[in-house]
Regions:
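Histidine- and acidic-residue-rich, metal-dependent catalytic cores
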Residues: 2-301
Length: 302
């Protein structure tokens, strides 16, 4: 048997050690990642968000000098942090304007919903803190519990920064995404209040040195984020797609053809609309498979 050990034995009152057969870990990881992927497809503006947050988490955890298993565990938490958004109504997710106070309150339920979703899963102990606490703040003004600096896990501190940075640099229906420099300034202005001071400072240094550039504005390594030229949301190009394949806007149903040449990717509108079958969510099993394999090998403690 293999032991998967959470770094902090006091995160929450569940198993301290998880015993899993070697051949079981990858399917268990994949079950969580695919679920998170399907939740993300509900919001046409967030394509690639979970992948980017996971990559930022990995880089920040590495920069902090954490052990390989901890880096993988926190990156996994980054990929799964928004599971609870399955409970958010479509009208709220897709609203082309700022949310009302009531709508924002409904959004604030997603950490607890996400934590309930993973209850009973054999790997829940690895990710529950990232899911439940990624909107908590050092100044105690976060949610859902208003935890203060002395009660925040490493997971929540890292995912909070990475999630906020990606949110700031991503376009929403009511605003364009910030530049890298603007987003780093936003983090700097909120050190010790919204964000951990030490972790945030290191993240800012990473951004200023160009170490985030290959993730920013991408939906996978080497695949720049594409947007619908008709209405604006993200149109995801998967790594196994080639020139001549189609991608679709899940907001207006517009179809576009993919062009790959000279290491560049472009999508060209066809003027057509996707069929109901074409608009079904597609899971990028190549991206997920690579993430799962990397995570599994790092998480295993013999």
């Amino acid at each position: 048997m293999i032991s998967l050990l959470p770094s902090s034995k006091s995160w929450f009152e569940i198993e301290k050690n998880i015993k899993i057969n070697h051949h079981e870990i990858e399917p268990l990881l994949q079950s969580l990642i695919v679920m998170a992927w399907m939740v993300e497809t509900r919001d046409p503006y967030t394509g690639g968000h979970l992948w980017r947050v996971a990559q930022y988490c990995r880089l920040l955890a590495e920069a902090l000098g954490l052990e390989k298993s901890e880096v993988a565990r926190i990156a996994l938490g980054g990929f799964l942090h928004d599971l609870g958004k399955i409970s958010v109504p479509d009208a709220t997710l897709k609203k082309p304007a700022r949310l009302s106070d009531q709508e924002y309150e409904s959004i604030k339920n997603h950490p607890e919903v996400g934590a309930r979703i993973v209850v009973g899963h054999p790997l829940a102990a690895l990710v529950k803190s990232a899911i439940l606490h990624h909107h908590e703040r050092p100044d105690g003004a976060g949610y859902p519990y208003g935890l203060d600096d002395g009660n925040l896990s490493v997971d929540s501190r890292i995912v909070s920064i990475c999630d906020a940075f990606d949110a700031m640099t991503s376009t929403r229906p009511y605003r364009l995404g910030m530049s890298l420099d603007q987003a780093l300034k936003g983090i700097k202005m909120n050190l010790h209040t919204q964000f951990d001071g030490n972790f945030g400072h290191i993240f800012i240094e990473m951004g200023q040195s160009g170490r985030l550039n290959h993730i920013l504005g991408h939906t996978d390594l080497g695949i720049p984020l594409q947007t619908c030229l008709t209405c604006g949301p993200t149109m995801v190009v998967r790594r196994n797609q080639k020139t001549g394949d189609h991608t679709y806007c899940h907001n207006c149903s517009a179809e576009a053809v993919i062009e790959k040449s000279n290491n560049k990717i472009e999508i060209i509108p066809t003027g057509l609309k996707g069929s109901s079958k074409a608009l079904q969510p597609n899971v990028d099993f190549d991206l997920i498979g690579e993430f799962v394999t990397t995570s599994a090998s790092a998480l295993i403690v013999q």
